[in-house]
Amino acid sequence: GNLPDVIYHTLQYVLPWAEAGILDVDANNDVVKALGKKTFAPGALNMAKSGSKIAAVPVDGWTQMVVYRKDLFEKAGLDAPTNYANITKAIKALSGDNMYGFVAATKTDENFMSQVLEHVLLANGVNLVKKGGTKKQGKALKNSLEFYKVLAKASPPGELYWKQSRALYFAGRTPMIIWSPFIMDELAGLRDSAPPTFNVDPTSNELAQKTGFITNFSGPNNKKGAAWADIRYFGITADADTDEAKKFIMYSMDEGYASTLSIAPEGKFPVRRGNSSDP
């Protein structure tokens, strides 16, 4: 069947869809040029490069987080989970009969596991797509995978992904998970379809008040640590009414950009910093 005029998609699809002819690279590049390349975060553009052109239009992004029970950490005298060592220590201290020390992602066919695992690897300085592969990263890679085993061992049995980690954190059954900032509204009791079950009031913000967030954490081989981020793009397709698709994106990314981001402000961080007159 015919493709939509515009697809809102993640970074991982930009180059494969460009190479497969699904995206109209020329049309998307035209929009980026019209909006002004200097108005975009350079990293968002560089990752969407197909040859000399930008294959899709950057829209927004978010940074993954370690979400943790700040109150339990403080009560146990634990440091915040800013590195492998602190997380491992917290798992040992806070695991119990009714408390899993961590809820990791273990369902291998879920994209969520790729996100969490890559975050853990980057935290320890491991880059899977680095030129030359992982040959020179052997020690750091081994340490990262051993740490992930610690996270998995502290987790409940079964195949786990975002759904279980959120549900168990909301129920007060784990002190730590890795999640996106999209958890923030439901954490505060503002989403009917995914309320906290921490207490009897599904609209309570008690759990939110007891929660802390870490965006950058580190491993023993990378003391400065790293964050993991996801970027989303608009892609005009090969089947599109090109002129109308361009108009839609131009509006959504310019005078309508605040409205675009307000769809989910907790997880839609701007990647366009200004406009052509004030980049």
Locate predicted features:
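Beta->alpha turn/N-cap motifs
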Residues: H9-Y13, W162, W179-M184, R232
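Glycine-centered hinge/linker elements that transmit conformational signals in sensory
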Residues: I91-S95, K131-E159, P202, L207-G212, ...
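C-terminal lobe and pocket-closing loops
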Residues: E186-P195, T203-N205, G219-P279
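Hinge/lid segment of periplasmic solute-binding proteins
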Residues: H9-T63, T88, M113-V116, P202-F217
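Extracytoplasmic "Venus flytrap"/periplasmic binding protein-like
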Residues: G1-F40, D71, K75-T82, T174-M176, ...
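Extracytoplasmic/periplasmic solute-binding protein
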Residues: S50-V59, Q64, N86-G133, A140, ...
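Loop/turn elements at helix/coil->beta-strand transitions in domains of secreted/extracellular proteins
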Residues: N2-D5, K53-I54, G96-G101, G172-P175, ...
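Short helix-initiation/N-cap motifs at beta->coil->alpha
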Residues: G1, Y84-K89, G158-A171
